[in-house]
Amino acid sequence: MAQVQYYGTGRRKSSVARVRLVPGDGRIVINDRDIRDYIPSEALIEVVKQPLVLTETLGNYDVLVNVKGGGFSGQAGAIRHGIARALLQVDPDYRPVLKRAGLLTRDARVKERKKYGLKGARRAPQFSKR
């Protein structure tokens, strides 16, 4: 018998996460490594688990993730987005809960480019009156 799997793709900053939910005991594996080995910060681990906690499905599914691009924060956000999208395939009734928490919305904030004549995106060189 083929095992049931649910897929979701999440994006944040320059990170892209391909998430697979498989019925299991709650393991989270990112790029073939345990979540605690991959993500250094406890706060970011909480970010990743947020959709599972809100829908009360934390111990019901194994989460298998392939993520690339960006840093830890962007990757954690992308994984969260992917898990939320995959949970919608599990049960469409989760939509209001996930939507209220803002987990289905792609966070469009990305780093603004540096402009010529300025020191950063908006920071101008120091101005001297005299």
Swiss-Prot record:
Question: In the UniProt record, which is one GO cellular component term?
Answer: cytosolic small ribosomal subunit
Q: Which Gene3D superfamilies match?
A: 3.30.230.10
By sequence similarity, the record places it as follows:
Belongs to the universal ribosomal protein uS9 family.
Q: Which GO terms describe its biological process?
A: translation
- Point out the gene that encodes the protein: rpsI
InterPro entries the record matches: Ribosomal_Su5_D2-typ_SF, Ribosomal_uS9, Ribosomal_uS9_bac/plastid, Ribosomal_uS9_CS, Ribsml_uS5_D2-typ_fold_subgr
Give UniProt keywords alphabetically. Answer: Ribonucleoprotein, Ribosomal protein
PROSITE patterns listed in its UniProt record: RIBOSOMAL_S9
The organism of origin for this protein: Geobacillus sp. (strain WCH70)
Q: Which GO terms describe its molecular function?
A: RNA binding; structural constituent of ribosome
- Protein name in the entry: Small ribosomal subunit protein uS9
One short Pfam name that applies is Ribosomal_S9
This protein's source sits in the domain of life called Bacteria
